[in-house]
Amino acid sequence: MKNSKAILQVPGTMKIISAEIPVPKEDEVLIKVEYVGICGSDVHGFESGPFIPPKDPNQEIGLGHECAGTVVAVGSRVRKFKPGDRVNIEPGVPCGHCRYCLEGKYNICPDVDFMATQPNYRGALTHYLCHPESFTYKLPDNMDTMEGALVEPAAVGMHAAMLADVKPGKKIIILGAGCIGLMTLQACKCLGATEIAVVDVLEKRLAMAEQLGATVVINGAKEDTIARCQQFTEDMGADIVFETAGSAVTVKQAPYLVMRGGKIMIVGTVPGDSAINFLKINREVTIQTVFRYANRYPVTIEAISSGRFDVKSMVTHIYDYRDVQQAFEESVNNKRDIIKGVIKISD
Protein backbone atom coordinates (compact mmCIF):
# COMPACT_ATOMS: atom_id res chain seq x y z
CA MET A 1 0.00 0.00 0.00
CA LYS A 2 1.17 3.52 -0.81
CA ASN A 3 -0.16 6.77 0.54
CA SER A 4 -0.26 10.39 -0.54
CA LYS A 5 -2.10 13.51 0.53
CA ALA A 6 -3.18 16.76 -1.06
CA ILE A 7 -2.06 19.85 0.85
CA LEU A 8 -2.54 23.57 0.41
CA GLN A 9 0.90 24.73 -0.70
CA VAL A 10 -0.15 28.40 -0.79
CA PRO A 11 -3.64 29.90 -1.18
CA GLY A 12 -4.82 28.92 -4.65
CA THR A 13 -2.44 25.99 -5.08
CA MET A 14 -2.94 22.37 -4.04
CA LYS A 15 -0.11 19.83 -4.23
CA ILE A 16 -0.20 16.05 -3.90
CA ILE A 17 2.77 14.73 -1.91
CA SER A 18 3.80 11.30 -0.68
CA ALA A 19 2.91 10.38 2.90
CA GLU A 20 3.42 7.57 5.36
CA ILE A 21 0.50 5.24 5.95
CA PRO A 22 -0.58 6.07 9.50
CA VAL A 23 -0.67 3.35 12.14
CA PRO A 24 -3.92 3.21 14.11
CA LYS A 25 -3.74 3.71 17.87
CA GLU A 26 -5.44 1.12 20.06
CA ASP A 27 -8.81 2.92 19.82
CA GLU A 28 -8.57 3.92 16.14
CA VAL A 29 -9.43 2.48 12.74
CA LEU A 30 -7.35 2.89 9.59
CA ILE A 31 -9.58 3.89 6.68
CA LYS A 32 -8.91 3.77 2.96
CA VAL A 33 -10.64 6.96 1.83
CA GLU A 34 -12.91 6.69 -1.21
CA TYR A 35 -14.84 9.97 -1.45
CA VAL A 36 -14.37 13.46 -0.02
CA GLY A 37 -16.98 16.20 -0.36
CA ILE A 38 -15.90 19.75 -1.14
CA CYS A 39 -17.31 22.04 1.56
CA GLY A 40 -17.62 25.81 1.36
CA SER A 41 -15.07 26.06 4.15
CA ASP A 42 -12.63 24.07 1.99
CA VAL A 43 -13.18 26.49 -0.88
CA HIS A 44 -12.55 29.44 1.45
CA GLY A 45 -9.39 27.74 2.69
CA PHE A 46 -8.21 27.16 -0.87
CA GLU A 47 -8.77 30.81 -1.78
CA SER A 48 -7.56 32.54 1.37
CA GLY A 49 -6.01 30.01 3.73
CA PRO A 50 -7.63 28.68 6.93
CA PHE A 51 -10.27 30.72 8.79
CA ILE A 52 -7.97 30.48 11.81
CA PRO A 53 -4.36 30.71 10.62
CA PRO A 54 -1.91 28.30 12.29
CA LYS A 55 0.51 29.69 14.83
CA ASP A 56 3.38 28.01 13.02
CA PRO A 57 3.86 29.59 9.56
CA ASN A 58 5.35 26.29 8.37
CA GLN A 59 2.32 24.25 9.43
CA GLU A 60 1.17 21.83 6.73
CA ILE A 61 -2.43 22.60 5.76
CA GLY A 62 -4.80 19.84 4.67
CA LEU A 63 -8.30 20.36 3.31
CA GLY A 64 -11.41 18.19 3.32
CA HIS A 65 -13.47 16.75 6.18
CA GLU A 66 -16.51 15.14 4.52
CA CYS A 67 -15.32 11.62 3.85
CA ALA A 68 -16.08 7.91 3.76
CA GLY A 69 -14.23 4.75 2.83
CA THR A 70 -13.36 1.22 3.90
CA VAL A 71 -11.67 0.00 7.08
CA VAL A 72 -8.35 -1.73 6.35
CA ALA A 73 -6.98 -2.15 9.90
CA VAL A 74 -8.10 -1.64 13.49
CA GLY A 75 -6.41 -0.89 16.80
CA SER A 76 -6.14 -3.50 19.55
CA ARG A 77 -9.12 -2.19 21.56
CA VAL A 78 -11.49 -1.60 18.64
CA ARG A 79 -14.59 -3.80 18.85
CA LYS A 80 -17.19 -2.25 16.53
CA PHE A 81 -15.30 -2.51 13.25
CA LYS A 82 -13.28 -4.96 11.20
CA PRO A 83 -11.37 -4.73 7.92
CA GLY A 84 -13.78 -4.50 5.00
CA ASP A 85 -16.42 -2.43 6.81
CA ARG A 86 -17.59 0.61 4.86
CA VAL A 87 -17.65 3.64 7.14
CA ASN A 88 -17.81 7.39 7.43
CA ILE A 89 -16.57 9.67 10.18
CA GLU A 90 -17.50 12.66 12.25
CA PRO A 91 -14.50 14.88 11.52
CA GLY A 92 -14.54 16.64 14.88
CA VAL A 93 -13.09 14.83 17.90
CA PRO A 94 -13.92 16.66 21.15
CA CYS A 95 -12.05 16.49 24.45
CA GLY A 96 -14.84 14.46 26.09
CA HIS A 97 -14.52 15.93 29.58
CA CYS A 98 -15.35 19.66 29.43
CA ARG A 99 -18.73 21.02 30.52
CA TYR A 100 -20.04 21.13 26.94
CA CYS A 101 -19.02 17.56 26.16
CA LEU A 102 -20.56 16.29 29.40
CA GLU A 103 -23.83 18.05 28.49
CA GLY A 104 -23.85 16.34 25.08
CA LYS A 105 -22.98 19.57 23.25
CA TYR A 106 -19.63 18.33 22.05
CA ASN A 107 -19.93 20.37 18.84
CA ILE A 108 -19.08 23.48 20.86
CA CYS A 109 -16.20 21.90 22.78
CA PRO A 110 -13.46 24.58 22.86
CA ASP A 111 -10.77 21.94 22.43
CA VAL A 112 -12.32 19.99 19.56
CA ASP A 113 -9.84 18.65 17.01
CA PHE A 114 -11.72 19.22 13.76
CA MET A 115 -10.21 18.09 10.48
CA ALA A 116 -8.64 20.72 8.20
CA THR A 117 -8.54 23.32 10.96
CA GLN A 118 -6.78 23.95 14.24
CA PRO A 119 -4.92 22.50 16.00
CA ASN A 120 -3.62 19.89 13.51
CA TYR A 121 -5.01 21.03 10.12
CA ARG A 122 -5.19 17.38 9.06
CA GLY A 123 -7.29 17.01 5.91
CA ALA A 124 -9.26 14.11 4.44
CA LEU A 125 -7.71 14.43 0.98
CA THR A 126 -5.49 11.41 1.42
CA HIS A 127 -5.60 7.70 0.58
CA TYR A 128 -5.37 6.55 4.21
CA LEU A 129 -6.28 8.15 7.52
CA CYS A 130 -6.81 7.03 11.12
CA HIS A 131 -9.83 8.03 13.17
CA PRO A 132 -11.21 7.18 16.63
CA GLU A 133 -13.65 4.28 16.74
CA SER A 134 -16.13 6.37 18.75
CA PHE A 135 -16.53 8.90 15.92
CA THR A 136 -16.69 6.36 13.11
CA TYR A 137 -19.97 4.95 11.76
CA LYS A 138 -20.72 1.82 9.77
CA LEU A 139 -22.72 2.43 6.60
CA PRO A 140 -25.84 0.37 5.86
CA ASP A 141 -25.52 -2.10 2.99
CA ASN A 142 -27.71 0.03 0.71
CA MET A 143 -25.58 3.18 1.12
CA ASP A 144 -22.44 3.73 -0.94
CA THR A 145 -19.41 5.68 0.22
CA MET A 146 -20.27 8.76 -1.83
CA GLU A 147 -23.50 9.01 0.15
CA GLY A 148 -21.48 8.24 3.27
CA ALA A 149 -19.22 11.23 2.67
CA LEU A 150 -22.26 13.49 2.32
CA VAL A 151 -23.67 12.51 5.70
CA GLU A 152 -21.50 15.27 7.17
CA PRO A 153 -23.20 18.25 5.46
CA ALA A 154 -26.56 16.47 5.73
CA ALA A 155 -26.04 16.29 9.50
CA VAL A 156 -25.63 20.08 9.57
CA GLY A 157 -29.08 20.44 8.03
CA MET A 158 -30.53 17.80 10.33
CA HIS A 159 -29.03 19.48 13.40
CA ALA A 160 -30.48 22.84 12.34
CA ALA A 161 -33.94 21.39 11.75
CA MET A 162 -33.98 19.44 15.01
CA LEU A 163 -32.71 22.43 17.02
CA ALA A 164 -35.50 24.48 15.48
CA ASP A 165 -38.06 21.85 16.51
CA VAL A 166 -39.45 21.46 13.00
CA LYS A 167 -42.80 19.64 13.06
CA PRO A 168 -45.74 18.95 10.75
CA GLY A 169 -47.86 22.05 10.23
CA LYS A 170 -45.07 24.59 10.61
CA LYS A 171 -44.32 26.94 7.73
CA ILE A 172 -40.64 27.18 6.87
CA ILE A 173 -38.60 29.70 4.87
CA ILE A 174 -35.04 28.80 3.88
CA LEU A 175 -32.79 31.63 2.71
CA GLY A 176 -30.13 30.12 0.46
CA ALA A 177 -30.25 27.00 -1.73
CA GLY A 178 -26.61 26.03 -1.67
CA CYS A 179 -25.56 22.68 -0.27
CA ILE A 180 -26.48 23.45 3.35
CA GLY A 181 -29.77 25.11 2.39
CA LEU A 182 -30.78 22.05 0.37
CA MET A 183 -29.71 19.74 3.18
CA THR A 184 -31.82 21.80 5.59
CA LEU A 185 -34.77 21.58 3.21
CA GLN A 186 -34.57 17.80 3.18
CA ALA A 187 -34.12 17.59 6.94
CA CYS A 188 -37.26 19.69 7.43
CA LYS A 189 -39.18 17.34 5.15
CA CYS A 190 -37.89 14.33 7.10
CA LEU A 191 -39.29 15.92 10.26
CA GLY A 192 -42.73 16.37 8.70
CA ALA A 193 -42.78 19.91 7.32
CA THR A 194 -44.78 20.19 4.10
CA GLU A 195 -44.90 23.96 3.51
CA ILE A 196 -41.37 25.13 2.72
CA ALA A 197 -40.30 28.16 0.68
CA VAL A 198 -36.71 28.38 -0.56
CA VAL A 199 -35.06 31.63 -1.66
CA ASP A 200 -31.93 31.96 -3.80
CA VAL A 201 -30.63 34.02 -6.72
CA LEU A 202 -29.45 31.11 -8.91
CA GLU A 203 -31.97 29.24 -11.05
CA LYS A 204 -30.06 25.93 -10.99
CA ARG A 205 -30.18 25.85 -7.21
CA LEU A 206 -33.86 26.74 -7.15
CA ALA A 207 -34.60 23.98 -9.66
CA MET A 208 -32.83 21.53 -7.37
CA ALA A 209 -34.82 22.83 -4.38
CA GLU A 210 -38.04 22.22 -6.30
CA GLN A 211 -36.86 18.73 -7.28
CA LEU A 212 -36.12 17.96 -3.63
CA GLY A 213 -39.57 19.03 -2.47
CA ALA A 214 -39.74 22.77 -1.85
CA THR A 215 -43.34 24.02 -1.96
CA VAL A 216 -42.37 27.43 -3.32
CA VAL A 217 -39.11 28.68 -4.84
CA ILE A 218 -38.31 32.39 -5.02
CA ASN A 219 -35.61 34.03 -7.11
CA GLY A 220 -34.44 36.92 -4.95
CA ALA A 221 -32.67 38.51 -7.92
CA LYS A 222 -35.93 38.78 -9.90
CA GLU A 223 -38.65 38.98 -7.26
CA ASP A 224 -39.35 40.93 -4.09
CA THR A 225 -38.33 38.33 -1.52
CA ILE A 226 -40.20 39.89 1.38
CA ALA A 227 -43.42 40.38 -0.61
CA ARG A 228 -43.34 36.82 -2.00
CA CYS A 229 -42.65 35.35 1.43
CA GLN A 230 -45.51 37.37 2.92
CA GLN A 231 -47.74 35.93 0.22
CA PHE A 232 -46.50 32.41 1.06
CA THR A 233 -47.25 32.89 4.78
CA GLU A 234 -50.51 34.83 4.22
CA ASP A 235 -48.92 37.84 5.96
CA MET A 236 -48.40 35.84 9.16
CA GLY A 237 -44.70 35.21 8.76
CA ALA A 238 -42.99 31.82 8.90
CA ASP A 239 -42.79 29.71 12.04
CA ILE A 240 -39.10 29.20 11.31
CA VAL A 241 -36.68 31.07 9.05
CA PHE A 242 -33.37 29.36 8.26
CA GLU A 243 -30.55 31.63 7.08
CA THR A 244 -28.15 29.30 5.25
CA ALA A 245 -26.57 31.64 2.70
CA GLY A 246 -24.11 33.28 5.07
CA SER A 247 -25.02 36.67 3.62
CA ALA A 248 -25.53 40.01 5.34
CA VAL A 249 -28.44 40.60 2.94
CA THR A 250 -30.37 37.51 4.00
CA VAL A 251 -29.63 38.08 7.69
CA LYS A 252 -31.16 41.54 7.31
CA GLN A 253 -34.23 40.06 5.58
CA ALA A 254 -34.91 37.36 8.16
CA PRO A 255 -36.66 39.56 10.80
CA TYR A 256 -39.18 40.66 8.16
CA LEU A 257 -40.09 37.06 7.32
CA VAL A 258 -40.63 35.46 10.74
CA MET A 259 -43.92 35.33 12.62
CA ARG A 260 -44.54 36.59 16.14
CA GLY A 261 -42.97 34.14 18.55
CA GLY A 262 -41.17 32.42 15.69
CA LYS A 263 -37.55 31.40 15.26
CA ILE A 264 -34.66 32.59 13.13
CA MET A 265 -31.97 29.95 12.73
CA ILE A 266 -28.57 31.28 11.63
CA VAL A 267 -26.98 28.29 9.90
CA GLY A 268 -24.68 30.09 7.47
CA THR A 269 -21.37 31.67 8.44
CA VAL A 270 -22.02 35.40 8.17
CA PRO A 271 -18.84 37.50 7.86
CA GLY A 272 -18.36 40.68 9.86
CA ASP A 273 -21.07 42.81 11.43
CA SER A 274 -24.67 42.52 10.25
CA ALA A 275 -27.51 45.00 10.69
CA ILE A 276 -30.69 43.57 12.25
CA ASN A 277 -33.86 45.59 12.83
CA PHE A 278 -34.63 44.63 16.41
CA LEU A 279 -37.98 46.41 16.28
CA LYS A 280 -39.10 43.72 13.85
CA ILE A 281 -38.17 40.92 16.24
CA ASN A 282 -39.43 42.59 19.41
CA ARG A 283 -42.29 40.07 19.43
CA GLU A 284 -40.67 37.23 21.33
CA VAL A 285 -38.76 36.02 18.29
CA THR A 286 -35.90 33.63 19.05
CA ILE A 287 -32.60 33.94 17.20
CA GLN A 288 -30.57 30.72 17.37
CA THR A 289 -27.16 30.12 15.83
CA VAL A 290 -26.27 26.64 14.59
CA PHE A 291 -22.76 25.18 14.79
CA ARG A 292 -22.00 21.91 13.04
CA TYR A 293 -23.93 19.09 14.80
CA ALA A 294 -23.93 16.82 17.83
CA ASN A 295 -25.42 13.32 18.02
CA ARG A 296 -27.02 13.66 14.57
CA TYR A 297 -25.08 11.13 12.49
CA PRO A 298 -27.25 8.08 13.35
CA VAL A 299 -30.55 9.77 12.46
CA THR A 300 -29.04 11.29 9.32
CA ILE A 301 -27.61 7.97 8.14
CA GLU A 302 -31.00 6.32 8.72
CA ALA A 303 -32.80 9.04 6.76
CA ILE A 304 -30.47 8.62 3.78
CA SER A 305 -30.59 4.82 3.95
CA SER A 306 -34.39 4.84 4.02
CA GLY A 307 -34.58 7.00 0.90
CA ARG A 308 -36.21 9.94 2.67
CA PHE A 309 -33.08 12.10 2.33
CA ASP A 310 -31.53 12.28 -1.15
CA VAL A 311 -27.92 13.46 -1.06
CA LYS A 312 -26.75 11.84 -4.29
CA SER A 313 -28.98 13.96 -6.55
CA MET A 314 -27.22 17.06 -5.25
CA VAL A 315 -23.85 15.93 -6.61
CA THR A 316 -23.29 17.82 -9.85
CA HIS A 317 -19.52 17.41 -10.22
CA ILE A 318 -17.21 14.45 -9.49
CA TYR A 319 -13.44 14.91 -9.73
CA ASP A 320 -10.58 12.44 -9.63
CA TYR A 321 -8.07 12.84 -6.82
CA ARG A 322 -5.30 13.64 -9.29
CA ASP A 323 -7.40 16.61 -10.48
CA VAL A 324 -7.68 18.17 -7.02
CA GLN A 325 -6.34 21.52 -8.27
CA GLN A 326 -9.00 21.64 -10.98
CA ALA A 327 -11.67 20.65 -8.46
CA PHE A 328 -10.93 23.62 -6.25
CA GLU A 329 -10.42 26.08 -9.09
CA GLU A 330 -13.80 25.17 -10.54
CA SER A 331 -15.39 25.35 -7.10
CA VAL A 332 -14.19 28.95 -6.92
CA ASN A 333 -14.91 30.01 -10.50
CA ASN A 334 -18.00 27.96 -11.35
CA LYS A 335 -20.23 28.50 -8.33
CA ARG A 336 -23.29 29.10 -10.50
CA ASP A 337 -23.21 25.54 -11.83
CA ILE A 338 -21.77 23.50 -8.96
CA ILE A 339 -24.30 22.52 -6.32
CA LYS A 340 -22.13 19.85 -4.71
CA GLY A 341 -18.72 18.68 -5.80
CA VAL A 342 -16.99 15.54 -4.57
CA ILE A 343 -13.51 14.15 -5.09
CA LYS A 344 -13.08 10.44 -5.77
CA ILE A 345 -9.94 9.34 -3.94
CA SER A 346 -9.98 5.61 -4.71
CA ASP A 347 -12.32 2.77 -5.68
Curated annotation (Swiss-Prot):
Keyword Ribosomal protein: no
Positions annotated to bind Zn(2+) 2: 95, 98, 101, 109
Cofactor note: Binds 2 Zn(2+) ions per subunit.
Record InterPro entries: ADH-like_C (IPR013149), ADH-like_N (IPR013154), ADH_Zn_CS (IPR002328), GroES-like_sf (IPR011032), NAD(P)-bd_dom_sf (IPR036291), PKS_ER (IPR020843), SDH-like (IPR045306)
Residues forming coiled coils: none
Family: Belongs to the zinc-containing alcohol dehydrogenase family.
EC code(s) of this entry: 1.-.-.-
UniProt entry keywords in alphabetical sequence: Metal-binding, Oxidoreductase, Zinc
PANTHER family: SORBITOL DEHYDROGENASE
Name of the protein in question: Uncharacterized zinc-type alcohol dehydrogenase-like protein YdjJ
